[in-house]
């Protein structure tokens, strides 16, 4: 097969380009599968009860306040976990980055993060705060490739 060894960085880039979540970054005990776009794995119409079932039923029926979305950057800087996300004008914090990398397939920096639901539409312009400067980005649907 001529396979070559690769490390965790390669795996992380591949999963991010595919839009797959990484527990500890994109998923945690502070987020729900519904917010992460994984509602298909939460079966709320079963008769048995399970931890957080009531919360998931409510989120499926009423919607969520934030949503995990992808974004593509217009700069060469790579977004990192915890960076703040602002609206297009940069005057309102609307979310945070969970994962980011340089995409070898797209040849641009990409990332995922949680956005307030009213800003979580593909095509929306946002800004990612990196250091003292904000960098323009565009919200996109997942997967990237």
Question: Locations of the language-model features?
Answer:
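Conserved, structured C-terminal
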Residues: 1-145
């Amino acid at each position: 097969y001529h396979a070559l060894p690769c490390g965790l960085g390669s795996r992380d880039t591949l999963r991010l380009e595919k839009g797959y979540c990484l527990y500890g970054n994109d998923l945690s005990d502070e987020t729900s599968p519904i917010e992460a776009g994984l509602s298909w794995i939460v079966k709320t119409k079963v008769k048995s009860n399970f931890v957080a079932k009531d919360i998931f039923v409510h989120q499926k029926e009423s919607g969520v306040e934030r949503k995990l979305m992808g974004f593509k950057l217009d700069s060469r800087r790579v977004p990192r976990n915890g960076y703040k996300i602002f609206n297009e004008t940069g005057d309102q914090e609307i979310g945070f980055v969970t994962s980011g990398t340089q995409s070898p397939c797209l040849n641009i920096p990409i990332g995922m993060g949680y956005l307030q639901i009213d800003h979580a539409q593909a095509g929306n312009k946002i800004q990612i705060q990196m250091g003292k400067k904000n960098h323009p980005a565009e919200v996109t649907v997942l997967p990237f490739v």
